[in-house]
């Protein structure tokens, strides 16, 4: 039998361990994700399964079923973080409403935008030019030329 590319010794997998297929994992709500990750889903046919939850994990599951307690220090999620809709459309984000402007409003906004952007460009150019004058030279690619001030 031909072997595939060799892995680093720490990354090699024992060939006797069955490979987990994602379709074998039941799809449950996200709150049980920690349980899914720690549960041993590798089961051979005919063998019985035993939950491999540690004591802190059992306590966590017990607290979830009983509700929040003062000892746990956990705060329940507020309604704004809990998505109560269960349909697939619940997670879809909708576009914000567009603001419709009249021709006059559009003209005013465009004029304001043009003035602001022109002023910004002028300020940037002025700042850049002042910097060039202070340094006394201009840079073109890899060559530097001295700025003649005409004095």
UniProtKB/Swiss-Prot annotation:
Record region (Disordered): 1-97
Null allele phenotype: Female mice lacking maternally transcribed Obox1, Obox2, Obox5, Obox7 as well as zygotically expressed Obox3 and Obox4 are infertile: embryos arrest at two-four cell stage due to impaired zygotic genome activation (ZGA).
Comp. bias (Polar residues): 37-54
Tissue expression as described in the entry: Specifically expressed in oocytes and early embryos.
Domain of life: Eukaryota
Family: Belongs to the paired homeobox family. Obox subfamily.
Annotated function: In contrast to other Obox family proteins, displays a truncated homeobox domain and does not bind DNA.
Protein name per UniProt: Inactive oocyte-specific homeobox protein 2
């Amino acid at each position: 039998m031909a072997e595939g590319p060799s892995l680093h010794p720490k990354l090699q997998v024992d060939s006797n361990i069955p490979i987990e297929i994602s379709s074998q994992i039941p799809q449950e709500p996200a709150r049980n994700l920690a349980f899914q990750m720690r549960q041993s889903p590798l089961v051979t046919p005919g063998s019985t399964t035993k939950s491999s939850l540690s004591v802190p994990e059992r306590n966590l599951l017990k607290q979830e079923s009983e509700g929040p307690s003062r000892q746990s220090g956990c705060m329940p999620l507020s309604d704004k973080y809990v998505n109560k809709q269960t349909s697939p459309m619940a997670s879809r984000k909708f576009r914000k409403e567009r603001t419709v402007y009249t021709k006059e409003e559009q003209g005013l906004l465009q004029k304001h935008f043009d003035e602001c952007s022109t002023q910004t460009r002028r300020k940037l150019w002025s700042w850049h030019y002042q910097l060039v004058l202070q340094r006394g030279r201009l840079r073109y690619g890899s060559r530097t030329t001295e700025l003649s001030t005409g004095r």
